[in-house]
Amino acid sequence: MNQVRKWNIIGGRVIKTGIAVFLTVLVCEFFNIPTIFAVITAIVTIEPTATDSIKKGLVRFPASTIGSAYAMTFTFFLGHQALSYALAAMFTIVTCQKLRLHAGTLVATLTAVAMIPITADHYFTAFLIRLATTSTGIIVSTVVNFFILPPHYVKTISGCTEELFVKTANVMEEWLTALMDGKVIKKETTYNLSKLTVLLHKAVQFVQYEQKDWKYHRHTKKEMRSFLLVQKQLHLLQQIIYHIDNLARAPIETCDWSQNEKEILRRTIHSIISILRNHCEKIDEEHFKLIDELDKQFWTNKNDLAHCKPNQYHHHFSSESIILFEVLSIHDMLEELKQIFEKYEGENQEKSILVDIK
C-alpha cells in the first residue's frame, strides 16, 4: 500500500486542474479575451467535490467582481501608483469579509492587484472583460470537476478504515506492553496515537466529501451498503480511539493488580487486539468469558471503593476501575462492529440468492 502511494504522484484532482486550464485557454482564445485571470480562477475553482466547486464558484464570481471594480476605480483616480495597489487590496479584502465571501477573497485580491498594471484606459471595458474571464474560469472548472473523473472516495475511505483497524490494534498492543511493565507509555506510543487520530479525521473528511456529491452521481445498492458500512465502522472506531486515548492517560504506575487480575486483563486485551486485526468479523466464546471475568473485576473494585471514607480516598474511581471501564467500553464497540458486519454480509448473501434465482 505504501509503495502504491509513493508512486501515485499525479492524482485525479491534478489531472482535472490541467484539463480545466487547457479548456479555459481554448475558450478564451476563441472569444479573443485575456487568459491569465480565467486560468487563475480555473485553478482555484477545482475543489475536492463538485458540490464545493459549485458553491465556491458562486462566491468567487461576485468577489472577483468587487476586486475588479476597486482596481479600476482606484486606477482611474490615482493611476498606477503604489497607493492604488494597497487600497485596491485592502478594500477588496474588507468588503469580501463583510459580505462573507470568504472563499473568494484570495482570488478577488489577486485579480484586483493584477489588473492595475495592465489597464491604461477604457476602464469600464476592462472591468466587463474581467467579469467574462472570471466567469469562463469558474464555469469550465465546475463542468470539468462534475463530469471528468468525478470524485469517488468510497475506496479511499475503505482503505483508511482497514488501516485504522490495524493501527488501532498496534497502539493497543503498545499500551498493553506498558501496562504489563507497570510503566508510563512511551513517547512513541503517544505519537502513534496522535497519528491514528489524524488518520481518523482524514477518513471522516473523505466521508463528508462523498456525502456532498452523493446526490449528483449514480450508485449501485452494493456501493451504497458498502459506504454505509464503512461510515458506521468509522463512527465506532472513533469511539474506540477515544477510549484508547483515555487508557493512554490512565495512571498505569499506580495500579495494584493481583497476578490473576493482571493475567485476565492481559488475555482480554490480546483478544481485543486480535479481533481488531480481523476487522471485528468474528468474536469467539473465549473472549466473552474473559469479558465476564473483567466485568466482575470492575464491579468488585467499584464496590470496594464504596466502603472507603472521604478522608481516605478522594476519587470516585481507582486507576484499576478506570482501565477496566475503558476496556469494557471498547468491547461494547467491538460487539457493535461485529453486528454491523454480520448485517452487511447477510444483505449481500440475500442479494446473491435473489440474483441466482432470477
UniProtKB/Swiss-Prot annotation:
InterPro entries: ArAE_1 (IPR010343). Pfam families: ArAE_1 (PF06081). The keyword Cell membrane applies. The chain crosses the membrane at residues 19-39, 74-94, 109-129, 131-151. Keywords: Cell membrane, Membrane, Transmembrane, Transmembrane helix. It is found in: Cell membrane. It is a multi-pass membrane protein. This is UPF0421 protein BT9727_2513. It comes from Bacillus thuringiensis subsp. konkukian (strain 97-27). The lineage of its organism: Bacteria, Bacillati, Bacillota, Bacilli, Bacillales.
